[in-house]
Amino acid sequence: MRLDELIEYLKYDDLINFKRVDITGISYNSKTTKQGDIFICLVGEHTDGHEYAQMAVDNGAAALLVERPLDNIKVPQVQVDSTRHKIADIADRFYSRPSLGLNLIGITGTNGKTTVTHLIQKIFEENQEKCALIGTLGYKLSSNGEYRDAKHTTPQAPELQATLRMIKDVEKIDNVVMEVSSHSLEQNRVGGCRYNGAILTNLTQDHLDYHITMENYFKAKALLFERLTEDDFAVINADDEYADKFLAVVPEGVRKLTYGVKNDADVMAKDIKFSLKGAEFKLVLKDAEYDVNLHMNGMFSVYNVLAAITSSIAMNIDIKIALKALQNVHGVAGRFEVVNKKPLVIVDYAHTPDGLENVLKSAREITPAGGKLICVFGCGGDRDATKRPKMGAIAQRLADKIVITSDNPRSEDPQQIITDIIAGLQSVDPEKVTVEPDRGEAIALLKSISDNNDVVVIAGKGHEDYQILKDKTIHFDDREQARKVFAGSVI
């Protein structure tokens, strides 16, 4: 594609050294820039792509997207107000607007995005339709397919648009269900994506290191709904504190549907019961009721299933097909995943106050009489520190014993993170509270402090198979560690 064609619809401030050159790719890493790329000079918290522009040109960049003119560089420069926001427009144009030919469904929320995307993919497949999935675990082209790695919940714009084009043209798939993070909305990584539907799971505290306030966090999430157009659909959790605010930003002509357990909604769950086998409830619609039996547990699973069912209704998929699909699902990797039965050991991705509270309440529902609920958890470094004491308080209130350990400490001192967590405890009773900074050792302790009728929750990392330390990233998988510790137990 020629540069003049690439920027035909782009709002730019100036053109420097402009000429018609062929653009054969998009790059924002000077080290991997190839001949014919347009190099995007991204400005971040710690690095400025403008400083690497010459290296990109030396590696073959045919043009630059810049926020300020760069002297002594002879290739064409397109100056814009924000390269971080305009990279999405460039990528969308370069890959010929792939989302326009897709039924693209976006799921946003603090917790539950991954599970809901998987559930909707299953519903499409039960309806004899192909559906690709993009999210935290990577992307995959079918529910039985292999994940391809992802560095972010929502990929960067060039990778995202390239993936959408591949899904449409190469794999011949028309439906895509996609996790949409607040960061990707705020940074416009999903700019250019034309969503046909948007789903809200919930909005609770997370990422305040980035958004600073809950109002800013809400505004970022709301962007997904504000961009919907006539004949699209919006699915909102009616029980969420921010439900009315989300409903208010949905444009006229967009079909609005709600789901919930407590507040009146279009789709509701009543008579909810939990057992070791899973959750069961009565699904209540405006004109019908259905008995639902799940192989997944916890109130959060009920909400996730309601979100998927409501979305299928919005897409005019037969409710019986949706229910058949959901009742055959056994969960998602690292989400309330059972890795041992006696004691019952559950690995979950819960890494927010709300997420931890939900998983512990759900675990309590299935803790046998006389059994203890034990929780191992930590908090990530270089992230919202205000949630640390809150998570400590929640764990102490809901579990009988807690083991405080490291999560992904990153550049922070693990002991300081633990100190922040302990600040939320009412007391530090050594019979009920154990501190072990080494996560592997913390999980190993479970063998000596648990009995067969106990329930153990290892929270925070879920599907992750790595741990990010100050100077390195190591292989670490909570599920592997737990299986080693309880080898020889009933699994």
Task: Name the predicted role of every residue range.
Residues 62-71, 135-138, 238-241, 261-262, ...:
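Short, polar loop motifs at secondary-structure junctions
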Residues 70-74, 171-174, 186, 195-345, ...:
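Acidic, Mg2+-coordinating active-site environments of NTP-dependent enzymes
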Residues 62, 196, 400:
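Receiver (REC) domain switch/active-site residues of two-component response regulators
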Residues 1-89, 93, 241, 268-273, ...:
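N-terminal leader/targeting and accessory segments in enzymes
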Residues 7-10, 87-238, 242-254, 306, ...:
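Phosphate-binding loop of NTP-binding sites
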Residues 66, 81, 135, 180, ...:
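Short loop/edge segments at beta-strand edges and connector loops
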Residues 1-12, 35-38, 254-255, 310-334, ...:
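ATP-dependent carboxylate-amine ligase
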